[in-house]
Amino acid sequence: MARILLIGTDEALLEGLAQSLAAAGHSPQIATSVVEGLEMSAAEPPLLSVVPHSLALARPEVLHVLLSNGSALLLYRTLGGDTSPLPPRVQRLVLADLMLPLERHRLLALVQFVEHRARTTGRVLPEPPEPRAD
């Protein structure tokens, strides 16, 4: 079970993503502000942070703080949102730049991939097996 931090102001989109991630067995957390997201990240570092594309353009230093907490970064934008390209130094920090909600299946696949890599490299301890009812 991967801990995923969703940061943004589009509550409907984030709630839908959180439900999809929870249904896939992950532990999503929603932060509606940057400050709240940074506090949540510092308290319990997430495996992945999903951040709005506009935030990466406006405040790239936030990405460095999230990375320093050990989180991989995914950026998202919505239909009709900002389509300006990311500066090269920001591009190198992020795993993917997704168009949500259209690419929500790609988001789930990336979460599974990062979780698998974290388990393989020993970053995340495997969960103990469920006790069997005999």
Regions found by a protein language model. Name each.
Residues 10-30:
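Two-component/phosphorelay signaling modules centered on CheY-like receiver
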Residues 14, 34, 47-70, 78-87:
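Conserved phosphotransfer microenvironments
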Residues 36-38:
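Short alpha-helical segment
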Residues 43-44:
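Active-site charged/polar residues at nucleotide-handling catalytic sites that mediate phosphoryl
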Residues 98, 102-112:
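C-terminal output helix
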Residues 118-134:
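CheY-like receiver
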